[in-house]
Protein backbone atom coordinates (compact mmCIF):
# COMPACT_ATOMS: atom_id res chain seq x y z
CA UNK A 1 0.00 0.00 0.00
CA UNK A 2 1.39 3.37 -0.98
CA UNK A 3 1.44 6.33 1.37
CA UNK A 4 0.88 8.72 -1.55
CA UNK A 5 -2.44 10.56 -1.63
CA UNK A 6 -4.34 11.38 -4.80
CA UNK A 7 -5.12 15.07 -4.81
CA UNK A 8 -7.57 16.80 -7.08
CA UNK A 9 -5.79 19.00 -9.59
CA UNK A 10 -7.10 22.54 -9.34
CA UNK A 11 -7.24 24.61 -12.52
CA UNK A 12 -7.20 27.93 -10.73
CA UNK A 13 -4.14 30.17 -10.52
CA UNK A 14 -5.07 31.71 -7.16
CA UNK A 15 -5.89 28.43 -5.44
CA UNK A 16 -2.59 26.90 -6.52
CA UNK A 17 -0.32 29.85 -5.82
CA UNK A 18 -1.60 31.42 -2.61
CA UNK A 19 -0.56 29.60 0.53
CA UNK A 20 -0.51 30.95 4.06
CA UNK A 21 1.71 30.00 5.57
CA UNK A 22 3.84 28.95 2.62
CA UNK A 23 4.24 25.16 2.84
CA UNK A 24 7.62 23.49 2.81
CA UNK A 25 8.28 20.87 0.18
CA UNK A 26 11.05 18.38 -0.35
CA UNK A 27 11.96 18.47 -4.03
CA UNK A 28 13.36 15.21 -5.31
CA UNK A 29 15.50 15.16 -8.44
CA UNK A 30 17.79 12.71 -10.21
CA UNK A 31 21.54 13.20 -10.13
CA UNK A 32 23.78 12.51 -13.12
CA UNK A 33 24.51 9.02 -11.79
CA UNK A 34 20.78 8.22 -11.51
CA UNK A 35 20.53 8.46 -7.73
CA UNK A 36 17.82 10.52 -6.08
CA UNK A 37 18.61 13.62 -4.06
CA UNK A 38 16.31 15.75 -1.91
CA UNK A 39 16.25 19.46 -1.18
CA UNK A 40 13.82 21.45 1.02
CA UNK A 41 12.17 24.59 -0.35
CA UNK A 42 9.38 26.90 0.73
CA UNK A 43 9.49 29.32 -2.19
CA UNK A 44 7.75 27.10 -4.70
CA UNK A 45 4.33 27.33 -6.31
CA UNK A 46 2.99 24.55 -8.53
CA UNK A 47 0.60 25.63 -11.27
CA UNK A 48 -1.89 23.78 -13.41
CA UNK A 49 -2.84 26.61 -15.73
CA UNK A 50 -0.93 25.77 -18.89
CA UNK A 51 -3.42 23.17 -20.11
CA UNK A 52 -4.46 19.65 -19.30
CA UNK A 53 -1.21 18.04 -20.46
CA UNK A 54 1.19 20.62 -19.01
CA UNK A 55 2.26 21.58 -15.54
CA UNK A 56 4.43 24.47 -14.43
CA UNK A 57 6.01 25.69 -11.22
CA UNK A 58 7.81 28.70 -9.89
CA UNK A 59 10.84 27.75 -7.80
CA UNK A 60 13.16 30.25 -6.12
CA UNK A 61 16.58 28.69 -5.59
CA UNK A 62 20.27 29.21 -6.28
CA UNK A 63 21.16 28.35 -9.86
CA UNK A 64 24.15 26.40 -8.56
CA UNK A 65 22.11 24.18 -6.22
CA UNK A 66 21.92 20.44 -6.81
CA UNK A 67 18.17 20.83 -7.32
CA UNK A 68 18.50 23.56 -9.95
CA UNK A 69 21.26 21.76 -11.83
CA UNK A 70 19.31 18.47 -11.86
CA UNK A 71 16.11 20.17 -13.06
CA UNK A 72 18.01 22.01 -15.80
CA UNK A 73 19.60 18.75 -16.95
CA UNK A 74 16.58 16.41 -16.66
CA UNK A 75 13.63 18.79 -16.83
CA UNK A 76 11.89 16.78 -14.09
CA UNK A 77 11.35 16.83 -10.35
CA UNK A 78 8.79 15.76 -7.77
CA UNK A 79 7.28 18.07 -5.14
CA UNK A 80 6.76 16.26 -1.84
CA UNK A 81 4.76 18.33 0.64
CA UNK A 82 5.75 17.72 4.26
CA UNK A 83 3.92 18.31 7.52
CA UNK A 84 4.73 21.22 9.82
CA UNK A 85 5.99 19.22 12.80
CA UNK A 86 9.28 20.49 14.28
CA UNK A 87 10.84 17.02 13.96
CA UNK A 88 10.09 16.99 10.22
CA UNK A 89 11.56 20.48 9.76
CA UNK A 90 14.74 19.45 11.59
CA UNK A 91 15.20 16.63 9.10
CA UNK A 92 14.48 18.96 6.17
CA UNK A 93 17.10 21.48 7.37
CA UNK A 94 19.75 18.74 7.35
CA UNK A 95 19.25 18.47 3.58
CA UNK A 96 19.63 22.17 2.88
CA UNK A 97 23.28 23.13 3.32
CA UNK A 98 24.80 24.75 0.22
CA UNK A 99 27.74 22.78 -1.11
CA UNK A 100 26.64 19.45 0.38
CA UNK A 101 26.98 16.70 -2.16
CA UNK A 102 24.10 14.20 -2.50
CA UNK A 103 26.53 11.35 -1.79
CA UNK A 104 27.26 12.98 1.60
CA UNK A 105 23.76 13.95 2.73
CA UNK A 106 21.52 11.19 1.38
CA UNK A 107 22.92 8.30 3.48
CA UNK A 108 21.91 10.29 6.62
CA UNK A 109 18.47 11.21 5.25
CA UNK A 110 15.57 10.12 7.48
CA UNK A 111 12.88 10.60 4.81
CA UNK A 112 11.66 7.28 3.46
CA UNK A 113 12.04 6.81 -0.28
CA UNK A 114 9.13 5.11 -1.96
CA UNK A 115 9.13 3.73 -5.49
CA UNK A 116 6.24 4.73 -7.68
CA UNK A 117 5.48 3.95 -11.30
CA UNK A 118 4.34 6.83 -13.46
CA UNK A 119 4.30 7.89 -17.08
CA UNK A 120 5.73 11.21 -18.15
Identify the meaning behind each predicted range:
Residues 1-37, 45-120:
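Active-site-proximal mixed secondary-structure blocks
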Amino acid sequence: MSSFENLRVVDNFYQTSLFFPMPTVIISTLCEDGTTTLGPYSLVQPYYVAGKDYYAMLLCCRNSSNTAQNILRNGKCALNFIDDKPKTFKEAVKLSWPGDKPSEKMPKCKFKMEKIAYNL
